[in-house]
Structures are given as structure tokens and as C-alpha cells.
From Swiss-Prot:
Keywords: Disulfide bond, Ion channel impairing toxin, Nematocyst, Potassium channel impairing toxin, Protease inhibitor, Secreted, Serine protease inhibitor, Signal, Toxin, Voltage-gated potassium channel impairing toxin. InterPro entries: Kunitz_BPTI (IPR002223), Kunitz_BPTI_sf (IPR036880), Prtase_inh_Kunz-CS (IPR020901), TFPI/VKTCI-like (IPR050098). Disulfide bonds join 21-71, 30-54, 46-67. This is U-actitoxin-Avd3j. It is found in: Secreted; Nematocyst. Gene3D superfamilies: Pancreatic trypsin inhibitor Kunitz domain (4.10.410.10). One of its GO terms (cellular component) is nematocyst. It comes from Anemonia viridis. Belongs to the venom Kunitz-type family. Sea anemone type 2 potassium channel toxin subfamily.
Length: 82
């Protein structure tokens, strides 16, 4: 019984979240100004940020829709603009 409870708790927390979505937002050191979206694991939303153009990571999406699809976010939970 305890095993099943633990299994469902872990499954509920991790459902729909791609590992890349847990990476931190990385603006990068370059000075370009590309509007992008990243998954904020604290707010559990896709949020807008300005990407510098280099040395980012996989938590960097061209559109809100792409971020929500990859990271399993429901549309009503987004967007939050920064």
C-alpha cells in the first residue's frame, strides 16, 4: 500500500515535465535581443524572457505554444511576462 502511494506521488509530480524544462533560464552572455519562452519550475508556467543569442540551454523556446507543449503546461496556466 505504501509503495502504491509513493508511486502515485512521484508520478503526479513528474507527469508532463520534460527534463529540459527543469533547467534554469539562461539569458547567455551575448547581446542579441531574442524574445523567447522558458518553463519556470517555481511558478509552473512558461514565461517570456530575452535571450542574448548564445550559450543558452534546452529550456529556451521560440513560442509560448512550443514551451507549453514540450513542458506539459495547460494554456490557462500561462503566460506570465517578465
Amino acid at each position: 500500500m505504501v509503495f502504491l502511494l509513493c508511486f502515485f506521488l512521484v508520478a503526479d509530480v513528474s507527469y508532463g515535465i520534460n527534463g529540459d524544462c527543469e533547467l534554469p533560464k539562461v539569458v547567455g552572455p551575448c547581446r542579441a535581443s531574442h524574445p523567447r519562452y522558458y518553463y519556470n519550475s517555481s511558478s509552473k508556467r512558461c514565461e517570456k524572457f530575452i535571450y542574448g543569442g548564445c550559450r543558452g540551454n534546452a529550456n529556451n523556446f521560440h513560442t509560448l505554444e512550443e514551451c507549453e507543449k514540450v513542458c506539459g503546461v495547460r494554456s490557462r496556466d500561462s503566460p506570465k511576462e517578465n
